[in-house]
Amino acid sequence: MIFGIGCDVCALDHLEKSLSGPHAAAFVRRVYGPAECTALALDTPLPAGHSGAHRLASAAADFAATEAFLKAAGTGLREPFALREIEAVRLESGAPAYRFSGATARWVADHGLTAHLSLSHDGGMALAFCILETAPET
């Protein structure tokens, strides 16, 4: 049974300002979890001559995934959720999936939820779509 559906978009140019501004390190620590920071190399400067377009698009999609989850949960950003506890990761197949930690993982487990995630980016925008599903009642 569907528990909730959430969708979010993120403008790449807006996120780029957050990732390159004077408070970029604090933003990354607050918003992205450890697996996302590693996969996106958010704590590593880009090599000279590298545009970072793919990294930026992936970071925007991951940010949108977090927002989409919060909308599907129906709570917005409030207790027990912390942004960095809601991570968008890639499976071995390349498909996106959620990884939860801390109080968010407990909330998901307590509600018996399975989270489904779809990501896309094009034309300077990233999109995430989240479906939270409960097990069918028997």
For each predicted feature, which ranges?
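Core catalytic alpha/beta fold that binds nucleotide/phospho-ligands
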Residues: 1-138
